[in-house]
């Protein structure tokens, strides 16, 4: 069955019953096929086919018809924290709160456990150009897996929990508890070397929740629980500079940070900071999307240090918990639902989790100077 539902004029609701918060969204990594995978705290992996058609113009903007078709659902034994497509094969990897790492092919009804972390498996990344699976867990272990033997080929043990990982080209960045950051040069794997180029403390004072790497692999962004994003540039061939409190850190004249996902509480005349729950980089245009606890998503032009667009999900300010952009750079998926940042006692104030598709108009994909 196909569905076509609009929300806030431009956002399209996928009418599927989701029992608990959506933790992760990933589009299929092909411009020709717009499959969307979701995973979350109801322990279900869901697949949707997303289609769009430009049917006209209104005030110089595209009028778009979007349809969403549920494809498959795969029940897991534990909530899903992360997922990744295995390139364009159609199969996926999932990481769960029980530490399990799983291989899933919904079309062939194949579900195989690949391995295990001693804590929750917070991140799974399939690195296409190296054909490897990377996983990071709350046990502090960063592992590369042999998909045939079900054993890690190599691993690196941190002293801190892994909260987020991101990569592009040869750059892998890891965000850990206590604001510890690390980055790796994946080209070193050809020399059987799997050691971080640098381990250091983030300049952001609050906990880093999400990290994403720029498309060109020349830098990355950190998103924190108190509504702040830091943009960091690096070069593998530049010697790190000693900065702040005796910690080795990367420092570039182009680095900057900014506040976001904050709301003014008029009665108290105070500023309420909300967590940045997820970020993604537009694979075509390089703009960055952040979603947060204030129920808004923002689109950022990092090069021009400016905001391209912002949008609120709904009137009750239900937090946004996950996001991704399709390979063509024009469809934005995001999930709304309680992010539990205020505790269980406030869960009843928010609506049931939902997944939306937003068509990015041309002026919202990139800066005016692109």
Residue ranges and their predicted role:
Residues 1-370:
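WD40-repeat beta-propeller superdomains and closely related acidic/aromatic-rich repeat-like regions
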